[in-house]
Regions:
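Conserved acidic/glycine
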Residues: 6, 20, 31-34
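Active-site catalytic microenvironments for nucleophilic, acid-base chemistry
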Residues: 19-20, 95
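Active-site phosphate/oxyanion-binding loops
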Residues: 28-150, 154-159, 165-170
Length: 170
């Protein structure tokens, strides 16, 4: 079959960056993202296979990959069941022991209300993992509750940043 969707997108982004002189490398998610027989991410497998991929490209400045796509325990192409790309970012961050996991969205950080609906909301600058997961569980659309778990287990802070205002602190 041919290239589709996210695969075409990441290849295009990679070629663009390389044309701009950036040492970017494409890391296909299907090479390291896998779920177990219960359709849950397999963090041990992810860490091992991702490290192998990273070691193949020591001089890269930027790594480009897909979100949400993976292989299941039977080797078939599948999707993460919940949280999609944000969950992928958290799983990767935990696998590489990142100093911070960044989730880019259309809102600057977690707010006390949804600023897409309520006027004059205020950002909540610091939350514990449990508080962020609870807000997400009870409807904060900016973040899916599953995204917090890998970051929590690895004790890595998660920063929610705004694609419309990239200089905002998040």
């Amino acid at each position: 079959y041919g290239l589709v969707g996210s695969e075409m997108c990441i290849r295009d982004r990679n070629y663009y960056l390389q044309e701009c002189g950036v040492k970017s490398i494409l890391l296909p998610a299907l090479e390291y993202m896998r779920t177990d027989k219960n359709a849950e991410p397999d963090p041990v497998y992810i860490k091992e296979k991702l490290q192998m991929q990273l070691e193949l490209h020591p001089g890269a400045e930027i790594y480009i990959t897909q979100g949400y796509i993976c292989r299941n325990a039977y080797g078939e192409i599948d999707n993460l069941q919940r949280g999609g790309s944000d969950y992928t970012a958290s799983l990767i961050g935990a696998a590489i022991n990142a100093s911070e996991i960044q989730i880019w969205t259309d809102i600057d950080g977690m707010h006390n209300n949804d600023p897409r609906i309520v006027d004059k909301t205020a950002p909540v600058r610091h939350l514990h993992f449990e508080e962020a997961a609870e807000l997400a569980y009870f409807g904060a659309k900016i973040l899916h509750p599953t995204c917090i778990q890998p970051a929590k287990y690895a004790n890595i802070p998660v920063r929610l940043l705004n694609t419309m205002d990239p200089t905002a602190p998040g």
